[in-house]
UniProtKB/Swiss-Prot annotation:
One of its GO terms (cellular component) is cytoplasm. It catalyses: 1-(5-phospho-beta-D-ribosyl)-ATP + diphosphate = 5-phospho-alpha-D-ribose 1-diphosphate + ATP. It comes from Vibrio vulnificus (strain YJ016). PROSITE patterns: ATP_P_PHORIBOSYLTR. This is ATP phosphoribosyltransferase. Pathway: Amino-acid biosynthesis; L-histidine biosynthesis; L-histidine from 5-phospho-alpha-D-ribose 1-diphosphate: step 1/9. CDD domains: PBP2_HisGL2 (cd13592). Belongs to the ATP phosphoribosyltransferase family. Long subfamily. It is found in: Cytoplasm.
C-alpha cells in the first residue's frame, strides 16, 4: 500500500515513544498527539505517524505497509528471526542506529548459584519473552535447554517454580536484584534504530527521507557536542589550543580593546572537564564558557 505521504511507525507508549517523538520534533516535524489516535498527521511536512505496539513495527516495515519505523534492535531481531523461521518476508534496511533506548538481553540465574559459563545452563528451563534470540544464542553455544514463554513478569518465574533461569531485558539490574537474581550472560546488546522498508521510493519521498536523516544526524551530533568560548593570552595560545578537545582547529578572533589577548571559539565532541578548565585558567585563559548546542550541520 503506497501513499504520497511518508508513513513512520513509532511505539504508541513508553520511553522509546517519547524519545522518538522528541527527536522528530527537534528535526522540525510539527505534530500534536491527542487521545488514542492511531494516525497523526504532521502539520508542516507530508508525514503521517502511526502509533502502534512496538512488536508490530518490524512486521509493518517488512510487509511494506509503512515506510520508516523506530524500533528497539531487540524487538527487530526477535521478529526477524521468527519470520525467517516461518518463511515470511523479513527484508528491511537500517538507516541509523540512534543514541537512546540502550538495553541488553541477559540470562539471569539465582544470586546464590555458581556460574562458570553457558554450559552450566545445559538442560535448564529458561523463561523469556524473546525465545528466538535466546534460541539463537544457545544454539551458537551448543547448549541444550527448554523455553518457558512468558509475555510479562519474567523475573518472577524462578521464584514461582516456572523456570530455572530467565532471559530478560536489563538496564540497571535493580529488578533482578529485587527478585533474588544475578546477571550471568549478556546475549544481545540493543539500542533504538531507524529502519525503512525495502524497495524504491518516489523521488520526493526519498528526498524527504534524506532530509530527515541529515537532520537526525545533526541533532545527535549536537547532543554529543559542546561550544567552547574563552579569552586567551596570545603568547600562551598554542599551549591553550593543545588542551582544548576540539575535532577541528579553533576559531581565533582579535579582541577590540586588547592586543595581547584573543577570543577562542570551537566545537568539541568531548566535554570540558573541571581539571582542564583549571589548567586553562592557570595559563591565563578567562571568560571560559561551555555551552550546549541545539542544532548542528557539517
Amino acid at each position: 500500500m503506497q501513499t504520497q505521504r511518508l508513513r513512520i511507525a513509532i511505539q504508541k507508549k513508553g520511553r522509546l515513544s517519547e524519545e522518538c517523538q522528541g527527536l522528530l520534533k527537534k528535526c522540525g516535524v510539527k505534530f500534536n498527539i491527542m487521545g488514542e489516535r492511531l494516525v497523526v498527521h504532521s502539520e508542516n511536512m507530508p508525514i503521517d505517524l502511526l502509533l502502534v505496539r512496538d512488536d508490530d513495527i518490524p512486521g509493518l516495515i517488512m510487509d511494506g505497509v509503512v515506510d520508516l519505523g523506530f524500533i528497539g534492535e531487540n524487538v527487530l531481531e526477535e521478529v526477524r528471526l521468527e519470520r525467517k523461521a516461518t518463511g515470511d518476508a523479513c527484508q528491511f534496511e537500517t538507516l541509523s542506529r540512534l543514541d537512546f533506548g540502550g538495553c541488553r538481553l541477559s540470562i539471569a540465574i539465582d544470586k546464590d548459584e555458581k556460574y562458570n559459563g553457558p554450559q552450566d545452563l545445559a538442560g535448564k528451563r529458561i523463561a523469556t519473552t524473546y525465545p528466538q534470540l535466546l534460541k539463537a544464542y544457545m544454539d551458537r553455544q551448543g547448549v541444550p535447554f527448554s523455553t518457558c514463554m512468558l509475555t510479562g513478569s519474567v523475573e518472577v518465574a524462578p521464584r514461582a517454580g516456572l523456570a530455572d533461569a530467565i532471559a530478560d531485558l536489563v538496564s540497571t539490574g535493580a529488578t533482578l536484584e529485587a527478585n533474588g537474581l544475578k546477571e550471568a550472560e549478556v546475549i544481545f546488546q540493543s539500542k533504538a534504530t531507524l529502519i525503512q522498508r525495502s524497495g524504491e521510493f518516489a523521488q520526493d519521498k526519498q528526498a524527504l527521507i534524506e532530509k530527515l536523516l541529515t537532520r537526525m544526524q545533526g541533532v545527535q551530533q549536537a547532543k554529543e557536542s559542546k561550544y567552547i568560548m574563552l579569552h586567551a593570552p596570545v603568547d600562551k595560545l598554542e599551549q591553550i589550543k593543545a588542551l582544548l578537545p576540539g575535532a577541528e582547529d579553533p576559531t581565533v578572533l582579535p579582541l577590540s580593546a586588547e592586543k595581547q589577548r584573543v577570543a577562542v571559539h570551537l566545537v568539541s565532541t568531548e566535554n570540558l572537564f573541571w581539571e582542564t578548565m583549571e589548567q586553562l585558567k592557570e595559563l591565563g585563559a578567562s571568560s571560559i564558557l561551555v555551552l550546549p548546542i541545539e542544532k548542528m550541520m557539517e
